[in-house]
Swiss-Prot record:
Keywords: ATP-binding, Cell membrane, Kinase, Membrane, Nucleotide-binding, Phosphoprotein, Transferase, Transmembrane, Transmembrane helix, Two-component regulatory system
Domain Histidine kinase: 363-579
Organism lineage string: Bacteria, Bacillati, Bacillota, Bacilli, Bacillales
Broad class of where this protein is predominantly found: membrane
Protein name per the record: Sensor protein LytS
Gene name in the database record: lytS
Lineage: superkingdom: Bacteria
Molecular function GO labels: ATP binding; phosphorelay sensor kinase activity
Reactions mediated catalytically: ATP + protein L-histidine = ADP + protein N-phospho-L-histidine
Topology within the bilayer: Multi-pass membrane protein
A Gene Ontology biological process term: cell wall organization
Localization terms from the record: Cell membrane
């Protein structure tokens, strides 16, 4: 029995080794994070199907309670049986991929075992399917929660599935005496090995995922810290002063030898190694930077030749160069240089890419602000382009606090913040946007607010289907929702509700935002939306600005209508209905 235990341990070691190799392949890691998708399930079926065949063909031949051979077998004699790790592969496939993956892998494994033959070979097809259903059930529960079974739970399930296997051997045998002899010899080693193998398999998966999450958390924290300190500079545009200030901060906080920022032609700043010949106000001298500007794609160099600096004494041996964009056009580059090309990591590349995206957004916002001031409708444009700095820094601080607690949630909120800024930028370019885009902007804003104040409020939408393509002024619903959150519920932490209603009213679009808050004082009701007020919670300037935009675009008939009592406040307006499809048609005709 001890000899059997050692031989089975060798077989489990082979499967575990393959699992470890797979978990260090980026494609497999991505697939594991998308287990609920059929594409990933199909790939898991292929992988575990191969594992199950390896488990079958590397089994140990048993006959009359003795080990006959541990060679690779394709066929067994009619009286022989086999001890293998087939149950392990089926069980783990179910715990990871769910019932469908497990059942198909179980059928593949069972048919493979049936092909090998031996005593009561059909029994193993039946047991494979039963084990697949049981392990798949437990796997389905964790997939719904986007988690994995604990190591302890996996070990218990591994033992249970092997016990079920032994039960099937005894239940479906044609020779009970032979089955009892077989089970008494293989049961204990196989139960222990299967339980241990399942636990080790899950340990590899969980430890790899934890390591990835920790790395993402560190990366996100680094990006946020750098973004928080460098954001003010790029709002003024891509120039020598802003580039110099940002590069100094990046060099201080990152493990790089030099930092450079360029526009499309000239070096704006270069700080660190190589600054004796990589000089600001001179033309770009590296071939790598020119390639990035031309292609618009991130590039990495691991040699001096790859960088393309032709100075004979240049100390730079590696570089990461990322394009900076303004309105989908390359405006310059952000460059990280290294004097040791062996320390360039994937995390450095991701960090550079993330910073470049944030800097590009800030450059776009800054340019939009400058352009807005030059337009005839500067007042409306500037109102639309406003991004509350307090809201932004509060959002950054909230995400920073979540990074080490829940990195996945922090990542989602960072995406929402990016969406929020993108919507602000789009709003700065247009007097109107579709209702659908406005609701996406509201959703991005609410995600960030809910992160700061969990379960503080609920929002309900009643949107007519025919209104989805309607054109409305940017931020109109967001401002009204934000106003309710900030003012209506300031003294109450629960049972707060906001209702957003958009419907057709004759030829106009009716927009209404209602809350069940404390209401507006009667002495302020007539002035809200027209003049600023003195208050500890705000001045009402957002509603004044919104009212000016509405009346400026559509006339006084579209001014805000505010009704308030102690049971809540309703703010509504009527604007002429115009469809984005109609607008697109008119533009096509005018061309």
């Amino acid at each position: 029995m001890l000899n059997l235990f050692i031989l089975l341990l060798e077989r489990v070691g082979l499967i575990i080794l393959l699992a470890y190799i797979l978990m260090n392949i980026n494609h497999f890691k991505t697939m594991m994070s998308e287990r609920d998708k059929w594409r990933s399930k199909f790939q898991l079926i292929i992988i575990f199907g191969i594992f199950s065949m390896i488990s079958n063909f590397t089994g140990i031949e048993i006959e009359n309670g003795h080990i006959v051979s541990s060679d690779i077998y394709y066929h067994l004699s009619k009286d022989a049986s086999m001890a293998n790790t087939r149950v392990l592969t089926i069980g783990v496939s179910g715990l990871i991929g769910g019932p469908w993956v497990a059942i198909i892998v179980g059928i593949i494994s069972g048919l493979c075992r049936l092909y090998i033959g031996g005593a009561d070979a059909y029994t193993y097809l039946i047991s494979s399917i039963v084990i697949a259903i049981i392990s798949g059930y437990f796997g389905h529960q964790t997939i719904k929660q986007n988690t994995y079974p604990s190591i302890k739970k996996g070990a218990i399930i591994g033992a249970i599935t092997e016990i079920i296997q032994m039960g099937c051997i005894l239940l479906f045998t044609n020779n009970l005496h032979h089955a009892i002899t077989l089970v008494s010899f293989i049961a204990l080693p196989m139960i222990i090995i299967n339980s241990l193998g399942t636990a080790i398999f899950l340990t590899i998966i969980l430890s790899t995922i934890k390591q990835e999450e920790q790395m993402r958390a560190v990366q996100t924290h680094d990006v946020l810290q750098l973004a928080n300190e460098t954001l003010p500079y790029f709002r003024s545009g891509l120039n020598e002063k802003s580039a110099q200030q940002a590069a100094e901060i990046i060099l201080k906080l990152m493990q790089v030898s030099a930092v450079a920022i360029t526009n499309k032609k000239d070096i704006l700043t270069h700080i660190g190694a190589g600054s004796d010949h990589h000089v600001a106000r001179k033309e770009i001298i590296t071939d790598l930077s020119k390639e990035v500007i031309q292609s618009g794609k991130l590039k990495v160099a691991h040699t001096r030749e790859g960088i393309g600096c032709h100075h004979p004494n240049c100390p730079l041996e590696g570089a990461i160069v990322v394009p900076l964009y303004i309105h989908n056009e390359v405006a310059g580059t952000l460059k990280f240089y290294f004097t040791d090309n062996n320390i360039i990591s994937t995390s450095d590349q991701q960090l550079a890419k993330g910073l470049a995206n944030i800097f590009s957004s800030q450059l776009e916002l800054g340019q939009a602000e400058m352009q807005g001031q030059l337009l005839k409708d500067a007042e409306i444009k500037s109102l639309q382009a406003q991004v509350n700095p307090h809201f932004f820094f509060n959002a950054i601080n909230t995400i920073s606090a979540l990074v080490r607690i829940d990195s996945e949630k922090a990542r989602r909120l960072l995406i929402q913040l990016s969406q929020f800024f993108r919507s602000n930028l789009n709003g700065a370019r247009n007097n109107t946007i579709t209702l659908q885009k406005e609701l996406q902007q509201v959703a991005a804003y609410l995600s960030l607010e809910q992160a700061r104040y969990p379960n503080r409020f609920n929002i309900h939408y009643r949107i007519d289907d025919q209104c989805q393509d309607a054109l409305i002024p940017p931020f109109i619903i967001q401002i009204l929702v934000e106003n309710s959150i900030k003012h209506a519920f300031k003294n109450r932490k629960k049972n707060n509700h906001i209702d957003v209603d958009v419907s057709m009213k004759q030829d106009c679009l009716s927009i209404s935002v209602q809350d069940n808050g404390q209401g507006i004082p009667a002495d302020q009701l007539d002035t809200i939306g027209y003049t600023t007020v003195t208050s500890t919670t705000g001045t009402g300037n957002a509603l004044v600005n919104l009212n000016k935009r509405l009346t400026g675009l559509f006339g006084t008939t579209s001014a805000l209508n505010i009704q308030s009592s102690q049971s809540g406040t309703t703010v509504s307006c009527l604007i002429p209905y115009k469809s984005s499809k109609e607008e697109h048609f008119n533009e096509s005709v005018n061309r």
